[in-house]
């Protein structure tokens, strides 16, 4: 499940990226684009309290993270709106791949921050960290779709 490995891996936001995110003063709904690359075998060495009795895949560890997370996400007003299997890019660096793509919608930056700092949610974060080799998280502001007439194309 691994692909191109960058010399730097990103599993958590930095202080600088967190400050920049808050400084954007985003208004309204927010969609978080998650690109996720799994470890072949989950690494629970930093979170032994969450480790299963036998080794599991990174994908299985991430499934445990999702199952732990969804109740807190829903309680914060958020929702997972898309989950899809990834692969290599059609347009992008050759050999770069992401195993899973996830879109998470939140009503506001405030609701996202309340969710992301909730102590019970954070108690399961070790599943995510054990699962991932690398990740990207891109906050997106929704734009209105253009209203353009559709064309009929004969196949």
Model-derived regions: residue spans:
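A common structural junction motif
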Residues: 120-126, 132
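Short S/T/G/P-rich N-terminal loop/turn motif that feeds into the first structured element of a domain
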Residues: 1-100, 107, 111, 141-155
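Short, hydrophobic/aromatic alpha-helical segments in well-folded domains
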Residues: 102, 111, 124-127
